[in-house]
Amino acid sequence: MDEIVVRCPVALGAFLKIAGVASTGGHAKLLVQEGAVTVNGQPETRRGRKLAAGDVVGVGEWESRVCSSAT
């Protein structure tokens, strides 16, 4: 599982772009609307959901843990 360091809280759509899973905001929106994204094992349909450190985001076989930066 990857660990991606971001400033928390971060929106789900922005996290998908930072992680390289979505190439654009529109692509992130499409992934979320299609139900392809999970947060902590549960399907998530809100692109603007705020993620916190420790949350696990999944798309298909890919999973990553949200890690908070110190600054």
Q: How would you describe each model-predicted region?
A:
Residues 1-8:
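A detector for short, charged/polar N-terminal pre-domain segments
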Residues 44-71:
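C-terminal structural segments of small proteins and small subunits
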